[in-house]
C-alpha cells in the first residue's frame, strides 16, 4: 500500500463525530479522506464506487446497521480494511462486528488516544481492539486456548489406551 495515498471512507451518522474523525485523519499527511457518508446503504455504495483502503464504520447507522454494511462492503470492496467505531462497549457486539472480517473495533470514548494507533495498526494488517474491551478478548482467547489444549489432551490420552 502506497503510504502517501491511503484513502479513507468515513461512515458516521452523527455529524460532530463524522467531522472529528475526518479532521483527525486529514491531519495525517499519508491519509486522504475520500468520502463521508451518514448511513449504511450509502456506505456500501460509496465503498463499491471508491474502493477505499480503509472504511471507518459506525455500528448504529440508519437504513442499514454497520455490521450488515460491513458484510456487504466486504463483498463489493474486498481489499478495503474495516475499522469499527462505536459507542457500544458490549464485547458481544464487538465480537459480532469483528466476525464480519473487520480488522478492528474502537470505542468512541477511547478515540482521543486510540484513533491514530488503531488506524495505523489496521493499515499494517494487524487487529486492533479498544483498551476498554481488550480484557474481555484476552480472557476469551485464554479460555479458548485452554479448552483446545484440554480437548487435544483428552484425544491423546484416549488414543494411548
Model-derived regions, located:
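Conserved acidic carboxylate
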Residues: 12, 153
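Short acidic/polar segment at the start of the alpha1 helix of CheY-like receiver
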Residues: 14-18, 129, 158
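Short hydrophobic/Thr-rich beta-strand motif most characteristic of the beta2 strand and flanking loop
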Residues: 30-38, 46
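Acidic catalytic/metal-coordinating carboxylates
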Residues: 39-42, 65-68
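Active-site residues of response regulator receiver
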Residues: 58, 86
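Short amphipathic alpha-helix used as the core "switch/output" element in two-component signaling
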Residues: 67-79
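Conserved phosphotransfer active-site motifs of two-component signaling proteins
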Residues: 89-92
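Short, flexible helix-to-coil linker/hinge segments that flank and couple to helix-turn-helix
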Residues: 94-99, 104, 109-150, 157
Amino acid at each position: 500500500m502506497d503510504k502517501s495515498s491511503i484513502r479513507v471512507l468515513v461512515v458516521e451518522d452523527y455529524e460532530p463525530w463524522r467531522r472529528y474523525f475526518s479532521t483527525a485523519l486529514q491531519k495525517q499527511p499519508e491519509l486522504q479522506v475520500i468520502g463521508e457518508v451518514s448511513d449504511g446503504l450509502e456506505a456500501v455504495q460509496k465503498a463499491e464506487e471508491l474502493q477505499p483502503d480503509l472504511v471507518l464504520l459506525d455500528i448504529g447507522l440508519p437504513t442499514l446497521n454497520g455490521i450488515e454494511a460491513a458484510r456487504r462492503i466486504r463483498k463489493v470492496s474486498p481489499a478495503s480494511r474495516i475499522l469499527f467505531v462505536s459507542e457500544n462497549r458490549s464485547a458481544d457486539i464487538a465480537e459480532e462486528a469483528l466476525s464480519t472480517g473487520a480488522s478492528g473495533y474502537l470505542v468512541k470514548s477511547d478515540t482521543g488516544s486510540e484513533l491514530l494507533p488503531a488506524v495505523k495498526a489496521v493499515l499494517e494488517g494487524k487487529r486492533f481492539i479498544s483498551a476498554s474491551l481488550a480484557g474481555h478478548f484476552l480472557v476469551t482467547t485464554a479460555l479458548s486456548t485452554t479448552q483446545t489444549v484440554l480437548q487435544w489432551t483428552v484425544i491423546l490420552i484416549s488414543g494411548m489406551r
